């Protein structure tokens, strides 16, 4: 029975402390309130039998609970009404009595005693039989069977008055009770009765669910879970004990120096853990740890309240139970047994304990381990205190001050070996950063192996294989190979003789013909690759070394412009001259200042230099002279003479005007300061731009290379105060990076920057020119505002790289949809597939500038650089460069800096330039000349003996082949049988720019067609070369085909014919030709399967059969045409295209075309 009493008292502790439960001996009931359990006594853990008895009692009580439930319900209903009248009378009396009492802290009492006045019940004693659900505690049923006699006046309640209810203690005690039960805090029994009556349906439903759960074996499952949990806790506690013993043993090995401070011999130091077990000693000799005096308590606190607060201060508690907060009521027999066990226990670990700092005895509260061993041990480190709301005596506060002082002095004595120093925390900027030691390669390898330990074997093997392959590739591959076995095979390196289908002259005859050439004909230069004949070495001795000289400064440039104005129809000659003169003056003055002061590459001009420069420019209107070291400046012509404002655009004005109208809706003032529009115009533009739709913020500029697309954007951005954010093909244009860099710019309307758009050194100089150069409008110019709106420019959007531009197209459409700033997309290919959606919305087409306007612009530019060039020469070079203005400007700058035409070159012979050397189209001032060798300078390189000086357009080759064959020096003269020789007739001029660029050679040529027949195979070969890479749409396509074509033609003519000077035709007649090969690639042209699967004969056959059927029927519209759905124009069903296809090849061979009734495949 001892074990049973022990277990039952443990569960009764939260609700009843002084009253004895039914079933316990009377001696326990008498001794429990008189002799309270000492908190310093170590209790033995419950035996295994007590756990089994506890499980059996829970099963029995669960069955008893169901039988008594109905009985208690009937009693509650009968006694509720009688108790209601008595409660109303007692309520008024209790209110008056409670007003006179002093507040006292809540202390731990029995469930019958909570809420009573002077230990007497306010309501009927029959009320005690009401069941109270207390977290499914098994002892709640014993409280219902108690007799009224047992509920008497307890000694504890009579000794002290009722304490004042503390809010926190009330909440902590109330959470142990179920909902609807407010036994401890209720003051009016009427409220309890009303609450119980209202909660009757809920209680019935809850009881019904509990019955169903018990029928299904819920109690057994709950007991099994609790047993399993207790077993796990027991195992964990045993493991913790073993680890604690191991730690204690390891700590005992460490030798610590004893403290020099005097210590009290009667007090032994505790273990290092703040939570140490203390037991009360019965004998001083067998004492393990001496008991310390209890904590000084407040006057209004009782032992139960103090013990409750000390246990609430524990930071770790059992999760599912609140029994750890209350002491376990034990019988005196158990206490005696535990005392004997504590006395007989030998001090096993006392000598090994490590002494730590000795603190005050009154600081650490004494906590008795009254919980069973299965409960987790609670740590007191950083515990919270719950007694702040209690009324404490002033004596305790006064004693706390010297305790802290003693403690501080004692800590200093113990730690005298390590003197305390005030730490100084410095900012990371002032802390010396020590270099990190290089990690050990073996450690890094071990870490890498640990991180890859979870990787599957298949992936690891693949990574190792890839790594080995990369290593092998790096070791074996050389960027620049040491030995190159691939070379260019010369034409004369073959062993066998060169097979030529026509007769050649002997070497003696060829040398005689070469010596017989006139003196004004062009010969090979000293640095050229010649045929190594004796005549070449003889003529090379007479060549003198030539040095290029600086061009002389022209004095009367305005006189040239006045003479040219009449010839330049509909071109602003004087406006162009004035703009270029201002730019030339400005940059020449800057270059002179830099050359004088020996300034660096930063192009910075000091204030003094700028002042003197402005004064000189204001006083002297003459042209500024550049320094001798850089007679034409240090900037490229493409940067030096590019337009800065909209009014400076002279060519290709229509697309620039359209782009300006698009940007004017985004600009604040509708344009620049000098070209600002009125408020009404700006308002109208904003309304128009708003009506463009959701995609009005994006514009696509499409045009060939060097047509002025990018230059127009930067010009208008500078004119309309925009800041350009450029993205070109040289950047890594992934979609993620593009969105991250431009998302902020697209969402913000303005960007504040002090710098100018374009931000380079040349751009800064151009801005200075913009402010100080144009004097006529200087008064109207206002300083530009610092607030610049952003503009996004995406260059080369039609060029995509698979590895570097992942997600670039999606990023463009995302920016176009979400951007609040204008987005301008520049493309060269109008048929780009991934930009078709943007091109269908807003697009501006740029065309190559007109040859006549560009030639006049370049003529004025060359005049400003003191090198006037013939207008026809500029047109020829511009057309030769496929209307590439950038390339023409670069070649023009190289030609001017090279000195223009040299005296020797003017007298020497060679392939004639397409100009008239006798008469020039441009008028000149007396004493100056016009340079006329610009075209020949780039079409006749020095390292080639003979070169065709016109673009190798193979449609023009048929026009010039007879003249080339007639001028051949190696072909023997032949005459056709019965035919005489005739001289070649001169061609008449049909060119809009100049007369036909041809002259009679005076040589005889045969009228026989054998000359063309000898080059038939050669014509086929160069036809294939002209079509190479026809399916590629990049900027190098034309140049590559041009070089290949030139190489084929020049080597063939030089090796097989050895042609000399001959006239040529640069402009072809406007003849309309149809060529299917222009739309096919190399693979199709050289593929036999493509030729055998040609579908055009089948289509022509279908068209002819449909035409014959329509002519034979009465109504031609009865049946639709077979190819009706495949017309060029979907909205029109005309058959004119099919009729045209029927007439193809009909006149040449009407019967040669077979009739085929094949149907086109889908």
From Swiss-Prot:
* Binding residue positions for ATP: 703-710
- What results from gene inactivation? RNAi-mediated knockdown in the ovaries, results in lower DNA content in the nurse cells and defective development of egg chambers. Simultaneous knockdown of elg1 and enok, results in relatively bigger and higher DNA content than single elg1 knockdown. Further, egg chambers in ~25% of the ovarioles are able to develop beyond stage 9 with morphologically normal nurse cells.
Instruction: Please provide, in alphabetical order, the Gene Ontology terms of the cellular component aspect for this entry.
Output: Elg1 RFC-like complex; nucleus
Per its record, what are the GO molecular function terms?
ATP binding; DNA binding; DNA clamp unloader activity
Coiled coil segments of this chain = none
Keyword set includes tRNA-binding: no
Query: Keywords for this entry?
Result: ATP-binding, Nucleotide-binding, Nucleus
Q: GO annotations under biological process?
A: oogenesis
Quote the biased-composition stretches of kind Polar residues, using this chain's numbering.
125-136, 998-1008
- Tissue expression notes: Expressed at higher levels in the germline nurse cells than in the somatic follicle cells.
- What is the designated name of this protein? Enhanced level of genomic instability 1
* Organism the protein comes from: Drosophila melanogaster
Q: What is the lineage of its organism?
A: Eukaryota, Metazoa, Ecdysozoa, Arthropoda, Hexapoda
């Amino acid at each position: 029975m001892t074990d049973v009493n022990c277990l039952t008292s443990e569960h009764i502790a939260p609700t009843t402390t002084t009253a004895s439960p039914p079933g316990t001996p009377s001696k326990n009931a008498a001794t429990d309130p008189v002799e309270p359990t000492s908190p310093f006594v170590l209790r033995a853990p419950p035996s295994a039998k007590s756990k089994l008895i506890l499980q059996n009692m829970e099963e029995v009580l669960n069955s008893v609970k169901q039988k008594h439930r109905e009985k208690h319900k009937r009693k509650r209903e009968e006694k509720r009404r009688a108790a209601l009248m008595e409660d109303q009378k007692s309520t008024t009396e209790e209110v008056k009595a409670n007003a006179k009492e002093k507040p006292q802290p809540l202390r731990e009492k029995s469930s019958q005693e909570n809420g009573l006045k002077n230990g007497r019940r306010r309501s009927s004693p029959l009320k005690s039989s009401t069941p109270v659900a207390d977290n499914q505690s098994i002892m709640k049923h014993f409280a219902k069977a108690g007799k009224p006699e047992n509920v008497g006046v307890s000694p504890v309640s009579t000794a002290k008055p009722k304490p004042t209810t503390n809010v926190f203690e009330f909440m902590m005690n109330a959470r142990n009770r179920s909902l609807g039960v407010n036994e401890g805090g209720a003051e009016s029994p009427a409220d309890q009765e009303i609450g119980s009556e209202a909660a009757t349906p809920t209680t019935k439903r809850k009881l019904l669910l509990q019955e169903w759960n018990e029928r299904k074996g819920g109690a057994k499952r709950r007991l099994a879970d609790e047993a399993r949990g207790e077993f796990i806790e027991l195992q964990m506690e045993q493991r913790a004990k073993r680890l604690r013993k191991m730690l204690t043993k390891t700590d005992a090995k460490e030798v610590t120096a004893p403290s020099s401070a005097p210590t009290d011999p009667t007090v032994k130091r505790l273990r290092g853990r703040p939570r140490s077990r203390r037991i009360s000693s019965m004998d001083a000799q067998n004492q393990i740890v001496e008991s310390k005096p209890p904590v000084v308590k407040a006057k209004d606190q009782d032992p139960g309240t103090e013990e409750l607060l000390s246990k609430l201060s524990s930071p770790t508690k059992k999760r599912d139970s609140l029994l750890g907060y209350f002491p376990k009521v034990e019988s005196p027999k158990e206490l005696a047994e535990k005392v004997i066990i504590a006395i007989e226990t030998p001090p096993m670990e006392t000598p090994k304990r490590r002494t730590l700092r000795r603190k005050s005895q009154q600081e650490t509260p004494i906590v008795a381990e009254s919980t069973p061993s299965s409960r987790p041990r609670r740590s007191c480190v950083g515990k919270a205190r719950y007694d702040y709301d209690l009324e404490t005596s002033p004596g305790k506060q006064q004693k706390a001050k010297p305790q802290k002082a003693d403690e501080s002095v004692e800590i200093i004595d113990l730690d005298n070996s390590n003197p305390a120093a005030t730490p100084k925390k410095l900012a990371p900027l002032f802390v010396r950063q020590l270099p990190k030691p290089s990690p050990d390669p073996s450690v890094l390898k071990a870490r890498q192996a640990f991180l890859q330990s979870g990787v599957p074997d298949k992936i690891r093997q693949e990574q190792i294989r890839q790594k080995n392959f990369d290593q092998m590739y790096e070791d074996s591959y050389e960027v620049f190979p040491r030995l190159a076995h691939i070379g260019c095979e010369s034409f004369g390196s073959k062993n066998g003789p060169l097979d030529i289908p026509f007769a050649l002259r002997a070497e003696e005859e060829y040398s005689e013909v070469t010596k017989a050439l006139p003196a004004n004909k062009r010969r090979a230069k000293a640095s050229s690759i010649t045929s190594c004949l004796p005549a070449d070495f003889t003529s090379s001795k007479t060549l003198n070394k030539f040095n290029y000289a600086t061009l002389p400064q022209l004095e009367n440039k305005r006189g040239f412009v006045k003479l040219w104005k009449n010839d330049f129809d509909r071109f602003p000659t004087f406006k162009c001259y004035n703009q270029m003169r201002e730019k030339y003056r400005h940059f020449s003055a800057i270059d002179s200042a830099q050359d004088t002061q020996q300034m660096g590459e930063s192009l910075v001009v000091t204030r003094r230099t700028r002042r003197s420069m402005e004064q000189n420019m204001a006083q002297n209107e003459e042209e500024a002279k550049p320094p001798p070291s850089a007679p034409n400046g240090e900037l490229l012509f493409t940067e030096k003479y590019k337009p800065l404002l909209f009014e400076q655009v002279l060519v290709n004005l229509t697309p620039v005007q359209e782009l300006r109208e698009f940007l004017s809706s985004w600009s604040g003032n509708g344009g620049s300061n000098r070209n600002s529009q009125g408020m009404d115009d700006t308002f109208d533009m904003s309304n128009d731009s708003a009506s463009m739709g959701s995609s009005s913020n994006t514009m696509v500029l499409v045009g060939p290379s060097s047509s002025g697309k990018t230059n127009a954007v930067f010009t208008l951005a500078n004119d309309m105060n925009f800041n350009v954010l450029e993205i070109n093909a040289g950047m890594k244009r992934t979609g993620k990076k593009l969105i991250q860099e431009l998302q902020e710019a697209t969402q913000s309307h303005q960007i504040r920057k002090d710098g100018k758009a374009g931000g380079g050194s040349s751009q800064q100089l151009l801005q200075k020119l913009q402010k100080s150069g144009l004097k006529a409008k200087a008064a109207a110019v206002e300083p530009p505002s610092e607030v610049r709106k952003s503009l996004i420019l995406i260059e080369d959007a039609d060029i995509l790289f698979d590895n570097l531009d992942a997600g670039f197209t999606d990023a463009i459409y995302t920016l176009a949809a979400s951007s609040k700033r204008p987005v301008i997309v520049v493309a060269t290919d109008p048929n780009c597939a991934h930009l078709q959606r943007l091109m269908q919305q807003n697009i501006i087409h740029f065309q190559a500038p007109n040859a006549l306007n560009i030639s006049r612009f370049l003529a004025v530019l060359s005049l400003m650089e003191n090198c006037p060039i013939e207008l026809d020469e500029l047109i020829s070079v511009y057309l030769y460069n496929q209307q590439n203005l950038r390339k023409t400007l670069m070649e023009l700058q190289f030609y001017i800096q090279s000195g223009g035409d040299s005296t020797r070159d003017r007298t020497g012979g060679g392939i004639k330039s397409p100009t008239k050397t006798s008469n020039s189209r441009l008028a000149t001032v007396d004493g100056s000349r016009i340079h006329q060798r610009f075209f020949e300078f780039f079409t006749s390189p020095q390292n080639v003996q003979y070169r065709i000086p016109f673009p190798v357009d193979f449609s023009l080759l048929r026009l010039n082949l007879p003249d080339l064959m007639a001028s051949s020096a190696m072909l023997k003269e032949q005459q056709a049988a019965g035919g005489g020789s005739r001289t070649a007739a001169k061609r008449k001029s049909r060119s809009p720019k100049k007369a036909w660029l041809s002259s009679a050679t005076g040589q005889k040529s045969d009228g026989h067609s054998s000359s063309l027949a000898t080059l038939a195979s050669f014509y086929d070969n160069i036809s294939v070369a002209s079509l190479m890479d026809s399916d590629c749409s990049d900027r190098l396509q034309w140049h590559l085909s041009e070089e290949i074509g030139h190489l084929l033609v020049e080597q063939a003519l030089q090796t097989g014919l050895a042609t000399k000077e001959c006239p040529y035709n640069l402009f072809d007649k406007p003849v309309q030709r149809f060529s299917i090969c222009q739309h096919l690639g190399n693979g199709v042209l050289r593929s036999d399967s493509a030729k055998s699967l040609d579908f055009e004969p089948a289509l022509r056959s279908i068209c002819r059969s449909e035409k014959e059927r329509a002519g034979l029927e009465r109504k031609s519209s009865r049946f639709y045409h077979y190819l009706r759905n495949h017309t060029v124009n979907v909205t029109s069903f005309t058959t004119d295209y099919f009729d045209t296809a029927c007439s193809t090849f009909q006149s040449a061979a009407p019967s040669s075309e077979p009739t085929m009734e094949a149907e086109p495949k889908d």
